[in-house]
C-alpha cells in the first residue's frame, strides 16, 4: 500500500521537474515523494523484522539498516544524475560519503549482533524435552531437501561469509564513498560517480544475498541445524 501511495507524487515530481524545473511546487512534491519513499522502505523492513522465527531479521538492527541503505543508494543515484546531467556531483558527493559511512557502521553493528546473539531455541526446548537433557534427532523429517531447508536453512561457511562481508564493505560502502568524495571535490565527477555506482550495485547485491543466506528459521532445528 505504501508503495502505491508513493507512485503519484514520485511521477508528479518527475513530470514537474521536466516541465517546470526546480521551482517551489516541484520541491514540495519532491519532498512528499521522498518522505513516502522512506515510509515504503520502513514498511518493507518491518515485513522482515516482524518474523519472530528468524532471529537474524527479528531484531532492532533490521529497520535502521534498511533505512540507511536506502538513503545511501538514493544519494548515490542522485549524485549519478547530477554528474551526468551537469558534469558536477557537488554536495551530493559529500552526501554519499556521509550516508555510506553511516550505512557501513550500521551494517557492521548488525553483523556483530547476529554473530553474538543467542539462539531463540534449541532442539530440546522446541520439543519440550529440555528437562531431560540433551536432545538429538534419530532421523531427519525428510529424505530429500524441502522448501524449509532450501529457503530458510541455507548453510554458508563462516570463512566464506566473512570474506563476502569484507567484499561488501569495500565495494558497497568504502570505495564508493571515497570515489564520491573525490567527485564532489571536482575530480572527473561523471567518471568517478559512474564507477562508484557500479561498485555500489555489486556490493549491495552481495549484501542482500548475505541477508537472506545467513537467515535461519527455527524450524531447521528439527533437521539438526
Where are these regions (language model features)?
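Membrane helical hairpin/interfacial module
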Residues: 1-9
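N-terminal signal-anchor module of multipass membrane proteins
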Residues: 201, 213-214
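Long, contiguous internal "core" modules enriched in hydrophobic/ aromatic residues
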Residues: 9-206
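Surface-exposed loop/turn and secondary-structure junction residues enriched for glycine/proline
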Residues: 51, 214-215
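Membrane-proximal cytoplasmic C-terminal regulatory module of class A 7TM GPCRs
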Residues: 216-225
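Short, function-defining helix-loop hinge/capping sites that tune catalysis or transport
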Residues: 115, 215-216
Amino acid at each position: 500500500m505504501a508503495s502505491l501511495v508513493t507512485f503519484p507524487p514520485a511521477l508528479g515530481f518527475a513530470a514537474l521537474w521536466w516541465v517546470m524545473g526546480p521551482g517551489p511546487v516541484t520541491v514540495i512534491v519532491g519532498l512528499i515523494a521522498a518522505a513516502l519513499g522512506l515510509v515504503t522502505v520502513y514498511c518493507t523492513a518491518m515485513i522482515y523484522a516482524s518474523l519472530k522465527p528468524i532471529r537474524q531479521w527479528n531484531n532492532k538492527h533490521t529497520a535502521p539498516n534498511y533505512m540507511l541503505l536506502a538513503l545511501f543508494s538514493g544519494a548515490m543515484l542522485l549524485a549519478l544524475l547530477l554528474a551526468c546531467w551537469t558534469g558536477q556531483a557537488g554536495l551530493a558527493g559529500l552526501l554519499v560519503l556521509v550516508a555510506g559511512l553511516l550505512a557501513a557502521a550500521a551494517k557492521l553493528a548488525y553483523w556483530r549482533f547476529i554473530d553474538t546473539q543467542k539462539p531463540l531455541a534449541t532442539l530440546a526446548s522446541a520439543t519440550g524435552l529440555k528437562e531431560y537433557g540433551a536432545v538429538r534427532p534419530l532421523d531427519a523429517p525428510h529424505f530429500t531437501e524441502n522448501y524449509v531447508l532450501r529457503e530458510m536453512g541455507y548453510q554458508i561457511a563462516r570463512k566464506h561469509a566473512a570474506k563476502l562481508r569484507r567484499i561488501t564493505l569495500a565495494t558497497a560502502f568504502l570505495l564508493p564513498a571515497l570515489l564520491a568524495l573525490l567527485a564532489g571535490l571536482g575530480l572527473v565527477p561523471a567518471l568517478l560517480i559512474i564507477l562508484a555506482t557500479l561498485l555500489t550495485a555489486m556490493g549491495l547485491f552481495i549484501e542482500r544475498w548475505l541477508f537472506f543466506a545467513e537467515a535461519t528459521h527455527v524450524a531447521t532445528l528439527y533437521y539438526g541445524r
